[in-house]
Amino acid sequence: YDLVGIFLETNSDKVDFRLRMQDFSADTHRRGVPWLGMPIHDLSTLDRILIIGSFLRKDHPLLAARIRQAVKRGAKVSVVHCSDDDLLMPVSAKSIVKPSQLPAALAKIAVALARHKDVVVPEAFARIEPSESDFFMAKSMASGANGAIFLGNFAVNHPAFSELQATAQWIAQILGAKLG
C-alpha cells in the first residue's frame, strides 16, 4: 500500500519491473507481459529443455525442481551459459562460453537446428558455422515432441538480450517448442 501511495503522491503511473535489464531494444515488438510460456505444473511433462543463461537452482528453485522431475521421467536438458553451474541433474549437452559470446553460441545452435530440419537460415546467420557439439545439441532438441526454451535471469540482463530473445524465439518456432 505504501508504494501505491508514493506513486499517487508523485502523480506517476509508470512502474517498471525490469530492474537489472540493460537491453530494451525489443520493447517495441513485445506484446503483453513476459511469462514462462506454460503453467508451472507442465514443466515436469517436458521431454526436451534448452536453458539459456540461467543459474537455475539459485534464481528459480521451483522451476529447477520441476525440471529435475522431467529429467527423472526421461527429459533431455541442454544448457547454453557462461558458467558451468551444477544443476544437480544429468545434462545432455552444454555450451559454456564467455558472456560476450552467448549470442553467437545460441546462433550456432540455431543454424545447426535449421540445417538439421532443412529450414532456410536467415541472412544474419548466413556466415555462421556450427560445431559438432552445436549439431549434437540441435539434434537432441529436435528429437523431442514436447520441448521448451527458457531464458534465465543472466540472459534477460545480458546487454544483447534482444538478440538472445529473437534467436530463442526462432529456435522455438522451428521446434514447435514453448518459450519462456
Regions found by a protein language model. Name each.
Residues 1-180:
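Catalytic alpha/large subunits of respiratory electron-transfer oxidoreductases
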